Amino acid sequence: MKRIIRLTEQDLTGLLKGIVDLALGGTANNKKDVTSKDEKETTSTDEKKTTSTDDKKSDTPNYNGDTGKVFLKGNFDSTQKANIELMIKYMNKSGIKDPLTQIGVLSVISKESNFRPKSEVSYANTSNSRIRKIFGSRVSKYSDSEMDSLKKNPERFFNVVYAKTVGNQGGGDGWKYRGRGFNQLTGKKNYEKYGNMIGRNLVGNPDLANDPTVAAEIAVAFFTKGKPGNAFPKFKNKTEAAAHFADINSGGGASRHRADAIAAVDKFDIKDIT
């Protein structure tokens, strides 16, 4: 005998409510699962981005650009690396192929311009005692208050400290032929001499010295003085090489910048090429 189940209106309402709750609950759970998946994917993507960025920041030790036997240990950006390659290219062309010699030159340039060819701009934030140490008798007649006023006007400052030195004759030569390039070429005489050596009109266009290729040509010509690259002494280590080229860059004699150039040698090493 079949049993007939009779449902009241209240029973039907409860049943329908249960079905709706079940449906909504499943949707909510599905949404939760989707959100969780999206969050995982976002987290994974962010982690990849972070790893990629960190790798890019610290990629110098693994850098395998055209630097010959010189291994870059410093944290250089792409512009600096390109300029280091330029320097090594022109050193090789001039016959400077010994890696210790190359590191000596690069260490001086690291100190002078950090591989970004530039013009001397201002000593406004340099202490008077430091300025007196750098320029000596050229500023000895100025009191501290006069020095404070002088260094606030860069053009006047360079016309004073570079007046009638290294071929400058006054009339704005100090400002016009202030330090530029990778190794901070200074003075009209040097602009003329090294411009002639590399076939560039640096006297007529001194800002040309800040072009990376020209800056590399100037630096190599300055350090070799037109001699073959193999004419340098055999250096025992990086420190000896950096000290030697710091002295050349200062015009001879023990350079006051020796310590800075020597400190920069740690940015470079010699590749173990077998």
State each model region's role.
Residues 1-27:
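Protein-protein interaction and targeting regions used for scaffolding, dimerization, and localization
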Residues 19, 23-32, 37, 44-93:
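N-terminal export signals and maturation junctions of secreted/periplasmic proteins
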Residues 61-115, 132-151:
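Export/targeting segments at the very N-terminus of extracytoplasmic proteins
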Residues 100-115, 147-168, 185, 219, ...:
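Short, functionally critical alpha-helical segments immediately adjacent to catalytic or ligand/cofactor-binding
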Residues 114-115, 123, 188-191:
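Short loop/turn segments at secondary-structure transitions that flank enzyme active sites
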Residues 131-182, 189-192:
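Binding-interface segments
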